[in-house]
């Protein structure tokens, strides 16, 4: 991944581990549909007692443990119904970028787990496992990243220089460039997974996208990132961070709408879409709590802010973000909801 983007690691109060319950709740909400998909759509040769499972974009836990255990339980149930093989063993590959906090991940592995665990550092936009070695893959809240921000967007002298720190949707030219990069990257992700999966293997994607017609700046996520951008501008104006650095600081994030995401998968032709389900999130939309919202976006974006502007710059930024969130709660309450999804893909 040319643009590294990792969550804040560790087990402290500002870590992703402590502020990822919202993401983890989607796996729980989708559990019944995941079980159904594994039971009816997984079509692999049950002649071996070894099943390989991988989580692409695992972060530092604990959600990845919930996701892989859900898959293991579902596959085990299918084995019991369709095979006489006993003593099934599971190998789980935890993949994320090399900057991910694998130490925390492995330190907090469930002690009673009944699987072998391996860490696989590397960009999931390319192949990270041998060909035809994987039976079931999962990726949760990871397919909104791009491998790099289009260079024109970061160039202050470019006609399409983006004044925002992300693709807010306010400029059609910026959206076009981000979407172009997103198509390339998701296509690469899918092609790599298709090479790794055995014939009839499944890839399950969970995450959030925009309903058709909804722009990023109309969503809670878009509003919060806009608050981060405006807060950075304020402290740059105070001379606390470098303005030139800020002008080129763009997040490698693109939130697709549902039609864009479906079209990219269909155009890739490596998979059959077995299910494209809207999931009712157990926690609904984000809570209207400034402390919660600020912390949630600090653990996801704060690491990138700190890497460029220092820890002090990051802390000052998020003090302002919290103030803006409190002030703008009435507008946040009117934000348009996103769509939480489960996509089940079978390798062709």
Swiss-Prot record:
The keyword Amino-acid biosynthesis is assigned to this record: no
Functional pathway: Sesquiterpene biosynthesis
An annotated Gene Ontology molecular function: metal ion binding
Binding site for S-adenosyl-L-methionine: 16, 57-58, 63, 94-97, 123-125, 140-142
Residues noted as binding Mg(2+) in the record, renumbered to the chain: 162, 247, 249
Binding residue positions for substrate: 16, 19-23, 141-145
Any Pfam family the entry gives: Methyltransf_7
Superkingdom to which the source organism belongs: Eukaryota
Description of activity control: Activated by Mn(2+) ions. Strongly inhibited by Cu(2+), Zn(2+), Fe(3+) and Fe(2+) ions. Moderately inhibited by Na(+) and Ca(2+) ions. Rapidly degraded at temperatures above 40 degrees Celsius.
Gene Ontology biological process: methylation; response to herbivore; response to jasmonic acid; response to molecule of fungal origin; response to salicylic acid; response to wounding
Cited SUPFAM superfamilies: S-adenosyl-L-methionine-dependent methyltransferases
Cofactor binding mode and count: Binds 1 Mg(2+) ion per subunit.
EC number, UniProt record: 2.1.1.325
Tissue: Mostly expressed in leaves and, at very low levels, in roots, stems, flowers and siliques.
Keyword entries, A-Z: Magnesium, Metal-binding, Methyltransferase, S-adenosyl-L-methionine, Transferase
Keyword Nucleotide-binding annotated: no
Induction remark: Induced in the presence of the herbivory P.xylostella larvae. Accumulates slighty in response to wounding and to several defense responses-inducing compounds including salicylic acid (SA), jasmonic acid (MeJA) and alamethicin (Ala), an antibiotic peptide of fungal origin.
pH behavior: Optimum pH is 8-8.5.
PANTHER family reported for this sequence: S-ADENOSYL-L-METHIONINE:CARBOXYL METHYLTRANSFERASE FAMILY PROTEIN
Description of how the protein assembles with itself and partners: Homodimer.
Family indicated by similarity: Belongs to the methyltransferase superfamily. SABATH family.
Function statement: May catalyze the production of the insect juvenile hormone methyl farnesoate (MeFA) to trigger defense against insect herbivory.
Entry protein name: Farnesoic acid carboxyl-O-methyltransferase
Organism this protein belongs to: Arabidopsis thaliana
């Amino acid at each position: 991944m040319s643009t590294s983007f990792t969550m804040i690691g560790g087990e402290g109060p500002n870590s992703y581990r402590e502020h990822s319950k919202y993401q983890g709740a989607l796996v729980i909400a989708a559990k019944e549909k995941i079980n159904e998909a594994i039971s009816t759509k997984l079509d692999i040769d049950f002649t071996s007692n070894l099943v390989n499972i991988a989580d692409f974009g695992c972060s530092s836990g604990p959600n990845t443990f919930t996701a892989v255990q859900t898959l293991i339980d579902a596959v085990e149930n299918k084995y019991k119904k369709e095979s006489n093989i006993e003593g099934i063993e599971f190998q789980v590959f935890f993949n994320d970028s090399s900057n991910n906090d694998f130490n925390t991940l492995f330190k907090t592995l469930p002690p009673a787990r009944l699987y072998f665990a391996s860490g696989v550092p590397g960009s999931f936009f390319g192949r990270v496992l041998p060909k035809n070695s994987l039976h079931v893959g999962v990726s949760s809240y990871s397919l909104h990243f791009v491998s790099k921000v289009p260079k024109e967007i970061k160039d202050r002298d470019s006609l399409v220089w983006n004044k925002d720190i992300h693709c807010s949707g306010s400029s059609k030219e910026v959206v076009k460039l981000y979407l172009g990069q997103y198509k390339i990257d998701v296509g690469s992700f899918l092609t790599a997974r298709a090479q790794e999966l055995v014939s009839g293997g499944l890839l399950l994607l969970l995450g959030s996208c925009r309903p058709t017609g909804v722009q990023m700046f109309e969503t809670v996520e878009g509003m919060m990132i806009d608050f981060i951008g405006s807060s950075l501008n304020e402290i740059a104006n105070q001379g606390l961070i470098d303005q030139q650095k800020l002008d080129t600081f763009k997040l490698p994030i693109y939130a697709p709408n549902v039609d864009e995401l479906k079209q990219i998968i269909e155009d890739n032709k490596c998979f059959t879409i077995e299910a494209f389900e809207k999931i009712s999130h157990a926690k609904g939309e984000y809570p209207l709590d400034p402390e919660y919202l600020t912390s949630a976006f600090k653990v996801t974006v704060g690491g990138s802010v700190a890497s460029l502007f220092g820890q002090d710059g990051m802390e000052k930024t998020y003090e302002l973000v919290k103030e803006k969130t409190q002030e703008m709660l009435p507008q946040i309450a009117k934000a348009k909801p996103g769509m939480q999804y489960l996509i089940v893909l079978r390798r062709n």
